[in-house]
Each structure stands twice: as structure tokens, then as C-alpha cells.
Amino acid sequence: MNRKKLLIIAHAPSENTKKMADAVVKGATNPEIEDVEVVSKAPLDTQPDDIITAQAVIIGTTENLGYMAGLVKDVFDRCYYPCLEKTQGFPFAFYIRAGHDGTGTQRAIESITTGLKWRLIQEPLLCRGDFQEDFLSQCENLGLTVAASLDAGII
């Protein structure tokens, strides 16, 4: 069986957001998941082919002025047209580290991915307010759930 690729694109400008990104990777690389290759990239390092060659993606962003991080938006700007015809139905999930409510960021991501015709496979994870250690277990669970679903052929 060919290994499936799960791409994790995470904007992690702080120690806490780096911990969250690492927790997503930790969940996705659970040793019981056998046929999934996890590739984690920063937004600036992500190219259209990274998305096109993946079977699913998890996007992590901060909420910046009620919107997604500029570097995450840059990924969509650079990858939108190269991916548009090649990734329709593409399974994805995302998490937001929101100092406030995260709804503007969520709407923006959902708007762009609707245009791409991607398929949201998990409710968005909104980590709101002051940082809580529970965010890490939620992020780990997100990575585990998406990778296990990909491994099992559910997505």
C-alpha cells in the first residue's frame, strides 16, 4: 500500500503556537498510524506542489486583527490557482489560535477553501482567549483524528 501524505501548514510565531503545531504533529505521527507520512511546513516554505501531492492538509493560524495570519493568506495567494483544478474535494482541517473570538479568521478560511472546493473534514478548532494547556491536547487530538482517518481510508 502506498503511504498517504498529510501536510501540516502551521504559522507558529510564538512559543505557545509552536507548542500547538508540535502537538498536531505529535498526534499525526502516533505510532499506531502506519501508512501516513506527515510533512510539516511553515507557510513561507509551502509551495503548490506540497498541497497537490498531499492527500489531506491541516492548517494552523493565529488570529491577527480579526483575520488569518498574513503568511497563511500568502499560502492561499500563491497556491490558489495552481491548486484550483487539481485539489477539488481535498480534505482539510484547521485550527486557530485566537486571542479574541476567531470568527473572522474562520470565515476567511472557509471562504477561500469553499472557492477551492475543498472538503472540511473536522469542525474548526478555535483556541480562544488566554493560552491554556488544554489547547495542546486538543491540537494533538486534531492531528491524530485526521491522520487516523486518512490511514483508514475514511477521508
Descriptions of predicted regions:
Residues 9, 41-43, 123:
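Conserved beta-strand termini and adjacent loop/short-helix elements that scaffold enzyme active sites
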Residues 34-45:
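A short beta-strand-loop structural module common to alpha/beta enzyme folds
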